[in-house]
Amino acid sequence: MANVLDTLMERGYIKQFTHEAETRELLEKEKVTFYIGFDPTADSLHVGHFIAMMFMAHMQKAGHRPIALIGGGTATIGDPSGKTDMRKMMTNETIAHNVACIKKQMEKFIDFSDDKAILVNNADWLLNQNYVEFLREVGVHFSVNRMLSAECFKQRLERGLSFLEFNYMLMQGYDFYVLNKKYNCKMELGGDDQWSNMIAGVELVRKKSQESAYAMTCTLLTNSEGQKMGKTVNGALWLDPEKTSPYEFYQYWRNVNDADVEKCLKLLTFIPMDEVRRLSSLEGSQINEAKKVLAFEVTKLVHGEEEATKAKQAAEALFGKGGDMSNVPTYEMGKDKLGSELLDILVEAEIVPSKAEGKRLVKQGGLSLNGEKVADFKKTLEEADFENGEVLIKRGKKNYNKIVLA
C-alpha cells in the first residue's frame, strides 16, 4: 500500500505528529481506522472544516477508513480551544438539527458505502454517562497540573475558565478511547488548534487500553499574512449553498491573493502536484488562469460540476466575456418596497450583513448600482433604477448580486 503520509506532507497538510516514525510504519503496513471530530455549532460546515474533510478524503483514497465523529455530546459543553470567552450553550434541539444538516453535507465528500467510512455521534455514549463512573474510569488518568499547562486552557485562565469547559479535554479523550475499543480506531486527525486535546486522547488510550494510538494535526487554512481564510463581508464562507451561494463561493477563490494560490491548490483540490507547481509558477496576469482553475475545482468539489460551471459562466458574463448572467445570485423584491432605502433592502436580501457594513462600503466607494457608485447612505431604490426589471449590485471589486422586481 502506498504511504499516504508522503502525499499529505508534500501537499502541506501535516503540522504535528505524536509519533512520526511509528505513524509512517503503521500507514505502510495496514489499513488504518482513524477519526476526525466535528462539533455541530452551526447547521453547516464552513471552509475551515473543508480542509479537514480533504485530509480525510486523501486518507480514504489511500485505503484507510475514516470515522467522522459529530460532537453532539461535546457540543453541549463547547470547546475552549482558541476561544477568549465561553461559548453560548445550545439547546439539545438545536444540536440535533445541526447534526442532521452536517451528516447530509459530509456524505457529499466521504464515501460511507460498504463500511468504507463510519459516521458516529458522541452523544450516543456521553449523554447517558454516569458522572461518578466517568471520573473513576477516565478522570484518574488526567493530571490537573498538566491540563492547566495546555495551551487551550492557558489562554482562558486570566479571563475565566468554567469547570464545564474544563471537562472538554476529558470528553474528547474519552471519544478516542470508545472508538478504539469499538472500531479499533488507532489515530486521530484534527486541526492544529486541537493539539492539546488530541495528545490527551492518545495518552488515555495508551494508558487505559494498553494499545498503540497516534495523532496528526492538520495545518489551519491561513493566508500568506497568517490570517484565517474563509471570511467574507457576510461572515463565514459556508459549504451550504443557502448560506453562501455557489457564485459567491467561486468568486472568493477566484480573488485570493497571488501568494495564496499554491497553498490553496495543494490543500483544497486533488490536482496532481506537477500541475499545481505549473499553475503556481505563472506570473503577472497569467496567475489569473491558476485562480480560475482553483475556483472551479474547489466549487466543483463542494457544490458539484453543474453549479461550478454556472458560477464560472456568471463570472465571465460580468467581466465582459459572454456567458449566462442568470446564474448571478438574485433577490426578488416586491413593488411595495420601491422607495425604500437601498441599504435596508440590501440587508433584507442578505447582500450586506448590516446597515453599518453597508454604510462602510458606501463611504469607501465599494458599492455600485448598475455600474454607478452609490455616494448617499440614504439612497432609495426607485422604479427608474430598474433596467428591464432588474438592478445589478456590485460590492467591492468583484462581488455581484441582482435585485429583480417580483
Curated annotation (Swiss-Prot):
GO process annotations (BP): tyrosyl-tRNA aminoacylation
Molecular-function annotations in GO: ATP binding; RNA binding; tyrosine-tRNA ligase activity
Subunit structure: Homodimer.
Gene Ontology, cellular component aspect: cytosol
Residue ranges of the motif 'KMSKS' region: 228-232
Similarity section: Belongs to the class-I aminoacyl-tRNA synthetase family. TyrS type 1 subfamily.
Residues that hold L-tyrosine according to the record: Y35, Y168, Q172
Native source organism of the sequence: Clostridium perfringens (strain ATCC 13124 / DSM 756 / JCM 1290 / NCIMB 6125 / NCTC 8237 / Type A)
Entry protein name: Tyrosine--tRNA ligase
Major site of localization recorded for this protein: cytoplasm
EC numbers on record: 6.1.1.1
Role of this protein: Catalyzes the attachment of tyrosine to tRNA(Tyr) in a two-step reaction: tyrosine is first activated by ATP to form Tyr-AMP and then transferred to the acceptor end of tRNA(Tyr).
